[in-house]
Design a protein with these regions (language model features):
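Outer-membrane beta-barrel "beta-signal"
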Residues: 165-176, 191-205
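Repeated loop/turn-to-beta-strand initiation elements of outer-membrane beta-barrel proteins
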Residues: 6-8, 40-45, 71-77, 107-113, ...
Length: 205
């Protein structure tokens, strides 16, 4: 029997985060995602509740991509459309990102390099880059510790460095929990750039 090409995930978190920043004004967020996979190709639709100063009350990501392996490296190339419903009139709240992930395991350490680019970002932000390096180690069959550090550069936007460290544990085949600390080097930019501890629960179907 052929595997179902569709998968679903529901989630709840103590706060919605994105690119190292708080995006739900320190309030809980719920999310959902549906993914279609066929061979290396995939498409997904993700939505989460948010609360941004520009009035946005949600974020919706529509992604198409392709995964493959080249010389021992896992490659994931994707195009992402971001839309932020509820944003005040006159603010650019829909934009497209281009993303490339390269991953490889070195002994017990799993690594991933991510490069994300847009030529016209949210609100007044224009060209922007997000470059992130992540590493993780399996503590046991159900638990993995990971850490990541990233640089954000943006024309007409804020430049900052972000990092996170945390532990994810599978409770069973469907439920998983994640406890993670997020922080940046620019607390002077506002509360969303300050350090925060985020707990999340996901259900995979």
């Amino acid at each position: 029997m052929a595997a179902d090409p569709f998968s679903f995930q529901l989630g709840v978190a103590s706060e919605y985060t994105g690119k190292g920043l708080g995006k739900s004004d320190e309030q809980p967020s719920v999310s959902g995602q549906v993914t279609w996979t066929q061979g290396g190709a995939y498409a997904s639709l993700f939505g989460a509740t948010a609360d941004l100063p520009q009035g946005s009350d949600a974020e919706i990501l529509t992604t198409i991509g392709y995964r493959t392996t080249v010389s021992g490296y896992g490659l994931d190339l994707s195009v992402i459309n971001r839309d932020l419903p509820g944003t005040r009139s006159g603010i650019d709240a829909n934009y497209t990102e281009f993303q490339a992930d390269a991953s490889r395991t070195f002994g017990p350490v799993a690594t991933r390099l991510r490069v994300n680019y847009t030529d016209d970002g949210f609100a007044g932000t224009k060209e922007a880059w997000w470059v992130e390096l992540q590493g993780g180690v399996a503590i046991n069959a159900a638990t993995k510790a990971t850490a990541a550090i990233a640089d954000r550069t943006a024309r007409n936007g804020n430049d900052y460095r972000a990092w996170n460290v945390g532990v994810k544990r599978k409770l069973d085949d469907r439920f998983a929990v994640d406890l993670r600390w997020y922080d940046t080097d620019r607390h002077d930019f506002g509360e969303s750039y300050e350090g925060r501890l985020v707990a999340a629960l996901t259900l995979s179907l």
